[in-house]
Every structure is written in structure tokens, then in C-alpha cells.
Amino acid sequence: MIYENAPAKINLTLDTLYKRDDGYHEVEMIMTTVDLYDRLTLEKRKDKKIVLKIEHRYVPNDHRNLAYKAAELMIERYNIKCGVTITLDKTIPIAAGLAGGSSDAAATFRGMNKLFELNLSLKTLAELSSEIGSDIPFCIYGRTSLCTGRGEVLEHLPKPPSCWVILAKPEISVSTQEVYSALDLSQAHEQIENEKCRRAIEAGDYLEMIRTLGNRLETVTIEMHPVIQMLKETMMKAGADVAMMSGSGPTVYGLAAKERQAKSVVNALKGCCKEVYMVRMLG
């Protein structure tokens, strides 16, 4: 039996450069992980079935689930002769811009590597995982990274300066595909400061880092769901140092240097948002 944690991610930056011939967008973004986890247990089966056990009415337990796809790909690629039971304890909000599904898949790749004693490197797992999802290679490592290409080309960075992270997920779900479809790059004038953010992280400069956060998709998702702007404003009024949407949304995160600031933000959000988490960066 193998246990794996699957941490959520947040985007410190996210820029979309152009739409590629393969239909994906070329991106440049800095992501890190936070200590909000799904937890997976993996056990060998005597038969050849993949059984995904999960008690969540909105999360599928078949090939529509990335963790299931990861198990399927590992069994096929490495000619594994038996099946696997994966028990998934879900904590990360779904369709939230926190890569919960991708992180579950990454944990499945890592877990099956251990369970079946394949001795594959993280680099090999990351390359394999890119076949089923663009964020999964990042989640394989779980380290702060500058991500390019579809998101699968990684350059690892140091852990960001220490701070508190407040996550607020409104009672809506967002389709990443829908957000990208609505993105008009000809109208995208905001400068996303990836290089400045990177340098701030490398220097351990918190104040410079928060000045350089940015998300190209934020205005698109806010137009669809104004509650995101309301959450950002609530966080800032309550004392957050910065507030930003993660990924394609709808989760908004705030950063706070001090614990009392973070607690003030959490208290301010309680009246308007059911899913609020106060966490730390792992990266």
C-alpha cells in the first residue's frame, strides 16, 4: 500500500503568448504549491481492473478522471500485469484553478512508480504525464517553477519568500477551455512581469514579488463571473498585500506577510464565501 499527497497549486504569474497550431496556447507562467492536499492510497489488485474510489458526487471515477487516466497509461506503457485500487480523499476544490485533478494524476504516477517498483525518475514521469495533461509535469515535481510551452516545460526556481496564502473559492465552477476561447490576445494590454517575478523570488524579495504578480486570464474570467473581482476587493480591504486569481479561476488567493493579516482576511471572507483556506507555500 502506498500513500501520496497531492498539493494544490497557485499561479504567481500567467501569460498567454499566442495560440499554437496544435490548438493549445503557448504560455509562460510561474507556479508554486500550497499545503492544501488531496490524499491518495494505492493498492495492488489480483485482477487487472483500475478501481478509483472517491466519495464526491461531482468527481467521476472512470476514464474522465485524470488519476484514472494516469493509472491506465502506466499499466499500458510498462506492461503492468495487475490492476490497482486508488482511494482518493478529496479536499482541493474542483474546477477551481488549483490543479486538483492534475495533482491527483501526478500523485498516481508517483504512487504507481513506487507500488510496482518501476524505479522511474521524476523526469521520466513528467515526460510521460505530459501526454494526458499540461499541468501534470509541474505537479509531478511540486516545486516552484517557470513553466513554458503548454506548461509542460519546466525550469525550477527557489521557494518563494515566506508568507501566508488565503484561498477563496466562490460557489461557481469555471471551464478552462471556455476561458481560453473567450481570450482575445489583441485586446491584452497588461504587461505580465514573469522575469521580474522570477528575479524577486530568486532574491527572496517579498515586496518586489507581490508587485510583479499577474494573470492574463483574470479579466476574461471576471467578465464572466464578477464575484471574482468582489473577492479580490474584499481581500485587499481586509489587509491582504495582494490578491490575484489563480489559473483560469475562479479561486482567488491573497498573500499576507503576517499571520494576523491573514486571519483578518479569512474573517472578512466568511460572510461571502464558503470555501476559504489559510495555507502556506510549499515550493
From Swiss-Prot:
GO molecular-function term, one example from the UniProt record: ATP binding
Pfam family, one: GHMP_kinases_N
UniProt-listed SUPFAM superfamilies: GHMP Kinase, C-terminal domain, Ribosomal protein S5 domain 2-like
Keyword GTP-binding carried by entry: no
Active site: K9, D135
Keyword GTP-binding: no
Catalytic activity: 4-CDP-2-C-methyl-D-erythritol + ATP = 4-CDP-2-C-methyl-D-erythritol 2-phosphate + ADP + H(+)
This protein's UniProt keywords: ATP-binding, Isoprene biosynthesis, Kinase, Nucleotide-binding, Transferase
GO biological process: isopentenyl diphosphate biosynthetic process, methylerythritol 4-phosphate pathway; terpenoid biosynthetic process
Ligand binding (ATP): P93, I94, A95, A96, G97, L98, A99, G100, G101, S102, S103
Family under the similarity heading: Belongs to the GHMP kinase family. IspE subfamily.
Known role: Catalyzes the phosphorylation of the position 2 hydroxy group of 4-diphosphocytidyl-2C-methyl-D-erythritol.
NCBIfam families: ispE, PRK14608.1
Name of this chain's protein: 4-diphosphocytidyl-2-C-methyl-D-erythritol kinase
Organism name: Macrococcus caseolyticus (strain JCSC5402)
Gene name of the record: ispE
